């Protein structure tokens, strides 16, 4: 799954109230460790605190790429969102 698809999932989850910023921060930490090269958004999200929901959303919106609509729909459905 690409980063943009995951970012869209987290954006929708945070704005719907079913995902909190701490979950996104933990994901960003994992991405930094596994990515061949870290990107600015990864470091920025990772350095946010759990109460900086809007800041996390802003950085998620900077993730480049194209979201895969099929994967995104499956993720959202699994979380009870559509």
Regions from the PLM with identified roles:
Residues 1-82:
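Acidic, Ser/Pro/Thr-rich low-complexity regulatory regions
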């Amino acid at each position: 799954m690409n980063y943009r698809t995951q970012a869209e999932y987290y954006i929708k989850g945070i704005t719907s109230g079913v995902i909190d910023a701490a979950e996104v921060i933990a994901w960003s930490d994992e991405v930094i460790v596994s990515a061949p090269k870290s990107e600015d958004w990864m470091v920025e999200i990772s350095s946010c605190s759990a109460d900086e929901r809007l800041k996390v959303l802003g950085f998620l919106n900077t993730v480049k790429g194209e979201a895969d609509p099929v994967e995104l729909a499956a993720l959202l459905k699994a979380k009870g969102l559509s």
